Curated annotation (Swiss-Prot):
Catalytic activity: D-glyceraldehyde 3-phosphate = dihydroxyacetone phosphate
Name of the protein in question: Triosephosphate isomerase
Keyword entries, A-Z: Cytoplasm, Gluconeogenesis, Glycolysis, Isomerase
A single MF term (Gene Ontology): triose-phosphate isomerase activity
InterPro entries: Aldolase_TIM, TIM_sf, TrioseP_Isoase_bac/euk, Triosephosphate_isomerase, Triosephosphate_isomerase_AS
GO biological-process terms attached to the record: gluconeogenesis; glyceraldehyde-3-phosphate biosynthetic process; glycerol catabolic process; glycolytic process
Location, primary (coarse class): cytoplasm
Annotated localization: Cytoplasm
PROSITE patterns for this protein: TIM_1, TIM_2
Annotated PANTHER family: TRIOSEPHOSPHATE ISOMERASE
Family annotation (Pfam families): TIM
Gene that encodes it: tpiA
A GO term from the CC aspect: cytosol
Domain of life: Bacteria
Species of the source: Mycobacterium sp. (strain KMS)
Amino acid sequence: MARKPLIAGNWKMNLNHFEAIALVQKIAFSLPDKYFDKVDVTVIPPFTDLRSVQTLVDGDKLRLSYGAQDVSQHDSGAYTGEISGAFLAKLGCSFAVVGHSERRTYHHEDDALVAAKAAAAFRHGITPIVCIGEHLKVREAGNHVEHNVEQLRGSLAGLTSEQIGQAVIAYEPVWAIGTGRVAGAADAQEVCKAIRDELGKLSSPQLAAGIRVLYGGSVNAKNVGEIVAQEDVDGALVGGASLDGEQFATLSAIAAGGPLP
Protein backbone atom coordinates (compact mmCIF):
# COMPACT_ATOMS: atom_id res chain seq x y z
CA MET A 1 0.00 0.00 0.00
CA ALA A 2 1.36 3.42 -0.95
CA ARG A 3 1.65 5.68 2.07
CA LYS A 4 1.82 9.44 1.57
CA PRO A 5 4.84 10.83 3.45
CA LEU A 6 4.22 13.09 6.42
CA ILE A 7 6.65 15.79 7.52
CA ALA A 8 5.78 17.18 10.95
CA GLY A 9 7.64 20.16 12.37
CA ASN A 10 7.79 20.13 16.16
CA TRP A 11 8.62 23.67 17.25
CA LYS A 12 8.88 22.67 20.92
CA MET A 13 8.94 25.72 23.27
CA ASN A 14 9.99 28.20 20.60
CA LEU A 15 8.36 31.19 18.87
CA ASN A 16 5.61 33.49 20.09
CA HIS A 17 2.41 33.90 18.09
CA PHE A 18 3.80 36.73 15.96
CA GLU A 19 6.86 34.66 15.07
CA ALA A 20 4.60 31.69 14.35
CA ILE A 21 2.73 33.65 11.70
CA ALA A 22 5.99 34.68 10.04
CA LEU A 23 7.30 31.10 9.98
CA VAL A 24 4.12 29.60 8.54
CA GLN A 25 4.08 32.29 5.86
CA LYS A 26 7.72 31.51 5.05
CA ILE A 27 7.03 27.78 4.73
CA ALA A 28 3.97 28.35 2.56
CA PHE A 29 5.86 30.81 0.34
CA SER A 30 8.90 28.54 0.01
CA LEU A 31 7.07 25.28 -0.80
CA PRO A 32 5.35 25.28 -4.21
CA ASP A 33 1.79 24.01 -4.17
CA LYS A 34 2.60 21.02 -6.40
CA TYR A 35 4.50 19.29 -3.60
CA PHE A 36 1.44 19.03 -1.37
CA ASP A 37 0.02 16.39 -3.70
CA LYS A 38 2.92 14.11 -2.73
CA VAL A 39 3.62 14.97 0.90
CA ASP A 40 1.54 16.02 3.90
CA VAL A 41 3.13 18.88 5.81
CA THR A 42 2.14 19.84 9.34
CA VAL A 43 3.51 22.21 11.96
CA ILE A 44 3.30 21.57 15.70
CA PRO A 45 3.54 24.96 17.45
CA PRO A 46 3.23 25.79 21.16
CA PHE A 47 -0.35 25.99 22.43
CA THR A 48 -0.25 29.80 22.56
CA ASP A 49 0.43 29.96 18.81
CA LEU A 50 -2.39 27.71 17.65
CA ARG A 51 -5.12 30.32 17.23
CA SER A 52 -2.83 32.56 15.17
CA VAL A 53 -1.79 29.61 12.99
CA GLN A 54 -5.42 28.57 12.56
CA THR A 55 -6.42 32.06 11.44
CA LEU A 56 -3.59 32.21 8.90
CA VAL A 57 -4.12 28.70 7.50
CA ASP A 58 -7.88 29.17 7.19
CA GLY A 59 -7.71 32.74 5.92
CA ASP A 60 -5.10 32.07 3.23
CA LYS A 61 -6.43 28.55 2.51
CA LEU A 62 -2.98 27.05 3.01
CA ARG A 63 -2.57 23.34 2.32
CA LEU A 64 -0.43 22.62 5.34
CA SER A 65 -2.02 21.40 8.56
CA TYR A 66 -1.12 21.92 12.21
CA GLY A 67 -1.34 20.16 15.52
CA ALA A 68 -0.55 20.32 19.23
CA GLN A 69 2.51 19.22 21.17
CA ASP A 70 0.44 17.41 23.80
CA VAL A 71 -3.15 16.72 24.87
CA SER A 72 -4.73 15.93 28.21
CA GLN A 73 -6.10 12.48 28.89
CA HIS A 74 -9.07 14.30 30.47
CA ASP A 75 -11.86 15.92 28.45
CA SER A 76 -12.71 18.67 30.98
CA GLY A 77 -12.68 19.45 34.68
CA ALA A 78 -10.44 20.58 37.52
CA TYR A 79 -7.11 19.82 35.87
CA THR A 80 -5.11 23.02 36.14
CA GLY A 81 -2.72 23.57 33.26
CA GLU A 82 -4.15 20.78 31.10
CA ILE A 83 -5.37 21.25 27.52
CA SER A 84 -8.41 19.25 26.42
CA GLY A 85 -8.71 17.58 23.06
CA ALA A 86 -12.06 19.35 22.76
CA PHE A 87 -10.26 22.70 22.82
CA LEU A 88 -7.71 21.54 20.26
CA ALA A 89 -10.44 20.25 17.97
CA LYS A 90 -12.15 23.66 18.06
CA LEU A 91 -8.84 25.19 17.01
CA GLY A 92 -8.75 22.89 13.98
CA CYS A 93 -5.83 20.72 15.07
CA SER A 94 -5.30 17.68 12.88
CA PHE A 95 -2.65 16.07 15.09
CA ALA A 96 -1.51 15.85 18.70
CA VAL A 97 1.92 14.58 19.66
CA VAL A 98 1.80 12.16 22.60
CA GLY A 99 4.65 10.43 24.39
CA HIS A 100 7.46 12.63 23.09
CA SER A 101 10.70 11.66 24.82
CA GLU A 102 10.93 15.09 26.44
CA ARG A 103 7.50 14.55 28.02
CA ARG A 104 8.53 11.08 29.15
CA THR A 105 11.82 12.36 30.59
CA TYR A 106 10.91 15.71 32.16
CA HIS A 107 7.29 14.97 33.10
CA HIS A 108 7.73 11.26 33.86
CA GLU A 109 4.98 10.18 31.47
CA ASP A 110 4.68 6.42 31.11
CA ASP A 111 3.19 4.21 28.42
CA ALA A 112 -0.19 3.98 30.17
CA LEU A 113 -0.55 7.77 30.22
CA VAL A 114 0.54 8.01 26.59
CA ALA A 115 -2.11 5.46 25.63
CA ALA A 116 -4.75 7.43 27.56
CA LYS A 117 -3.73 10.62 25.75
CA ALA A 118 -3.89 8.86 22.38
CA ALA A 119 -7.41 7.67 23.22
CA ALA A 120 -8.38 11.21 24.22
CA ALA A 121 -7.13 12.56 20.90
CA PHE A 122 -9.24 10.03 19.02
CA ARG A 123 -12.32 10.96 21.06
CA HIS A 124 -12.09 14.44 19.58
CA GLY A 125 -11.26 13.52 15.99
CA ILE A 126 -7.55 14.28 16.31
CA THR A 127 -4.85 11.93 15.03
CA PRO A 128 -2.24 11.13 17.69
CA ILE A 129 1.42 11.03 16.72
CA VAL A 130 2.58 8.40 19.19
CA CYS A 131 6.29 8.70 19.98
CA ILE A 132 8.55 5.88 21.11
CA GLY A 133 12.31 5.48 21.25
CA GLU A 134 15.31 4.13 23.12
CA HIS A 135 18.11 5.68 25.16
CA LEU A 136 21.74 5.19 24.16
CA LYS A 137 22.38 2.46 26.74
CA VAL A 138 19.58 0.38 25.28
CA ARG A 139 20.94 0.86 21.76
CA GLU A 140 24.49 -0.05 22.81
CA ALA A 141 23.21 -3.18 24.55
CA GLY A 142 21.53 -4.27 21.33
CA ASN A 143 18.05 -4.27 22.89
CA HIS A 144 16.64 -1.39 20.87
CA VAL A 145 14.19 -3.40 18.78
CA GLU A 146 12.68 -5.21 21.76
CA HIS A 147 12.52 -1.97 23.74
CA ASN A 148 10.62 -0.12 21.03
CA VAL A 149 8.20 -2.97 20.39
CA GLU A 150 7.39 -3.18 24.10
CA GLN A 151 6.97 0.59 24.34
CA LEU A 152 4.70 0.52 21.29
CA ARG A 153 2.45 -2.09 22.88
CA GLY A 154 2.14 -0.10 26.08
CA SER A 155 1.54 3.20 24.30
CA LEU A 156 -1.31 1.77 22.20
CA ALA A 157 -2.90 -0.35 24.94
CA GLY A 158 -6.68 -0.07 25.01
CA LEU A 159 -7.02 1.34 21.50
CA THR A 160 -9.15 -0.50 18.98
CA SER A 161 -7.68 -2.01 15.84
CA GLU A 162 -9.37 0.72 13.83
CA GLN A 163 -7.84 3.44 16.00
CA ILE A 164 -4.39 1.90 15.76
CA GLY A 165 -4.84 1.85 12.00
CA GLN A 166 -5.43 5.62 12.01
CA ALA A 167 -2.56 6.57 14.33
CA VAL A 168 0.85 7.89 13.30
CA ILE A 169 3.89 6.38 15.01
CA ALA A 170 7.12 8.33 15.44
CA TYR A 171 10.33 6.46 16.19
CA GLU A 172 12.70 8.90 17.87
CA PRO A 173 15.89 7.43 19.34
CA VAL A 174 16.41 9.60 22.40
CA TRP A 175 20.17 9.75 21.88
CA ALA A 176 19.64 11.43 18.49
CA ILE A 177 17.23 14.19 19.55
CA GLY A 178 18.84 17.61 19.42
CA THR A 179 22.33 16.12 19.53
CA GLY A 180 23.23 16.22 15.87
CA ARG A 181 23.62 12.45 15.94
CA VAL A 182 21.35 10.62 13.53
CA ALA A 183 20.44 6.97 13.33
CA GLY A 184 21.67 5.56 10.04
CA ALA A 185 19.03 4.96 7.41
CA ALA A 186 19.44 1.21 7.85
CA ASP A 187 19.07 1.57 11.62
CA ALA A 188 15.89 3.60 11.18
CA GLN A 189 14.54 1.01 8.76
CA GLU A 190 15.32 -1.84 11.16
CA VAL A 191 13.25 -0.35 13.97
CA CYS A 192 10.48 1.03 11.76
CA LYS A 193 10.01 -2.38 10.15
CA ALA A 194 9.80 -3.99 13.59
CA ILE A 195 7.22 -1.36 14.53
CA ARG A 196 5.14 -2.12 11.45
CA ASP A 197 5.36 -5.86 12.08
CA GLU A 198 4.12 -5.35 15.63
CA LEU A 199 1.35 -3.03 14.41
CA GLY A 200 0.21 -5.91 12.22
CA LYS A 201 -0.16 -8.05 15.33
CA LEU A 202 -1.92 -5.31 17.30
CA SER A 203 -4.38 -4.51 14.49
CA SER A 204 -4.04 -6.44 11.24
CA PRO A 205 -1.41 -6.72 8.51
CA GLN A 206 -3.75 -4.85 6.17
CA LEU A 207 -4.18 -1.93 8.57
CA ALA A 208 -0.49 -1.91 9.46
CA ALA A 209 0.41 -1.56 5.79
CA GLY A 210 -1.31 1.83 5.76
CA ILE A 211 0.02 3.25 9.04
CA ARG A 212 2.60 6.00 8.69
CA VAL A 213 5.76 5.46 10.71
CA LEU A 214 8.01 8.50 11.03
CA TYR A 215 11.63 8.90 12.10
CA GLY A 216 12.62 11.70 14.45
CA GLY A 217 16.06 12.76 15.63
CA SER A 218 18.24 15.54 14.15
CA VAL A 219 16.50 15.36 10.76
CA ASN A 220 17.49 18.06 8.28
CA ALA A 221 17.50 18.74 4.55
CA LYS A 222 20.80 16.89 4.11
CA ASN A 223 19.73 13.55 5.57
CA VAL A 224 15.96 13.39 5.10
CA GLY A 225 16.16 11.97 1.57
CA GLU A 226 18.04 8.83 2.58
CA ILE A 227 15.85 8.33 5.64
CA VAL A 228 12.47 8.57 3.92
CA ALA A 229 13.71 6.39 1.05
CA GLN A 230 13.57 3.41 3.41
CA GLU A 231 10.66 1.04 2.80
CA ASP A 232 9.10 1.40 6.24
CA VAL A 233 9.89 5.05 6.97
CA ASP A 234 7.05 7.34 5.88
CA GLY A 235 8.32 10.75 6.83
CA ALA A 236 9.89 12.60 9.72
CA LEU A 237 9.18 14.34 13.00
CA VAL A 238 11.49 17.32 12.62
CA GLY A 239 12.79 19.40 15.51
CA GLY A 240 15.29 22.22 15.14
CA ALA A 241 15.22 22.27 11.34
CA SER A 242 11.48 23.02 11.43
CA LEU A 243 12.24 26.48 12.83
CA ASP A 244 13.97 27.42 9.56
CA GLY A 245 11.23 28.00 7.00
CA GLU A 246 13.40 27.49 3.94
CA GLN A 247 15.05 24.33 5.25
CA PHE A 248 11.72 22.88 6.38
CA ALA A 249 10.23 23.58 2.95
CA THR A 250 13.25 22.00 1.28
CA LEU A 251 13.17 18.81 3.32
CA SER A 252 9.39 18.58 2.74
CA ALA A 253 10.02 18.82 -1.00
CA ILE A 254 12.70 16.14 -0.79
CA ALA A 255 10.28 13.86 1.04
CA ALA A 256 7.83 14.47 -1.81
CA GLY A 257 10.38 13.08 -4.22
CA GLY A 258 12.23 16.07 -5.55
CA PRO A 259 14.29 19.08 -4.44
CA LEU A 260 12.98 22.58 -4.77
CA PRO A 261 13.71 24.14 -8.19
